[in-house]
Structure formats: structure tokens, C-alpha cells
Amino acid sequence: MSNLIIRPAIEDDAEELAELLNEIIRIGGTTAYQSVMDKGDIIRDFVRSKWLLSCFVAEMEGKVVGFQHLDAADPEYSGPFKLGAGWSVIASFVRVDHHGQGIGRRLFQETKTAAKQAGSFAIDATIRADNTLGIAFYQNLGFRTYVTIEDVPLSDGTRMDRVRKKYDLTVEE
């Protein structure tokens, strides 16, 4: 995959990122997001999010084939997914027709560096329990399950467990 370029996301990527994420949302079952997003949503929630540490895109032959977003844990959040200072939160998305090609792993190399540079000691990945591909992806990167939160409502009211995985940045590889 020598023609894969990993670079920081910019606002001009937002339309392609929305297209990529919306395809995943429409298929269903692999993201907690259930409502399609437009360019403005992508800029607000990923490219320029309030607690942004990094957002990287994977580009192949001029086309975005994946992106990975990392926020610092939101100190204002008080819900069931509350994390303390020093934690960061990851979200990863790869075009369905590009799964299994190492794109997420390449993105994570950059994301992990950004997390360390920001002073994070751990990265959280919160994954729907029915997303077996996502659970395996994070497990293969070195994330380990630290808690399962049961019966969390999705935006449509469906109840779903969430598996929380932690990547410990304090352990040398």
C-alpha cells in the first residue's frame, strides 16, 4: 500500500468525509452514529471539534479512503461514558470496499503519536457490542476491553451494549 498517504484532515475534506461516513451509517451496525451528516457536521464534530487532538485522513490516488479522529476526553460531559483528564477518545472510519488493507492501522500510527504529544496516557474506543469487526480491529491494534456498558439507547431507541476498549500509552512497545 505504498500509494497510501496519511495527512491531517482539512475543512476541504469535509464533503468526502461525510460521504464516507454516511455510507457506513446507511449500511448500519458498525457505528453508533445513526443520522447522516453534512459537511458542516463533519467540520464541527471531527475536523474542528471542540476537544480536537487530531484528525487524519488516508488518501489513495486522490480519494479519501479512511479517517481517524481523536478528541481529548470532554471535561464537561457527565454521562455514562465519562472519562477523566489524560484520556482521549478515538473514532475510526474506512470505506467499506477498503476494509482489511491496513488503512486503519496506518492511521493509528499517526493518531497514537498525536495522543502522546498531547499528553494523553490512554485512548478509549467505545464500540457497539454488535460491531464485531470494530471490536476485532481495536483488539488487533492493542486495545483491551476494560468495561462493557449494558443497554445503552441508540438515537432511534434501540438498546445496545457498548464495549469500551483502552489503549495504554504508558506501556512501551
Report each predicted region and the residues it spans.
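Conserved catalytic-core motifs of GNAT/GCN5-like acyltransferases
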Residues: 71-77, 124-127, 139, 144-161
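Conserved GNAT-fold acetyl-CoA-binding loop/helix
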Residues: 18, 22-45
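Residue-level preference for beta-strand/loop junctions
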Residues: 50, 86, 119, 159-161
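Conserved GNAT acetyl-CoA-binding A-motif
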Residues: 115-127
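Acetyl-CoA-dependent GNAT
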Residues: 11, 35-97, 108-109, 168-171
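A short beta-loop-alpha structural element at the N-terminal edge
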Residues: 5-17
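Conserved acetyl-CoA-binding loop-helix of GNAT-fold acetyltransferases
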Residues: 100-113, 136-140
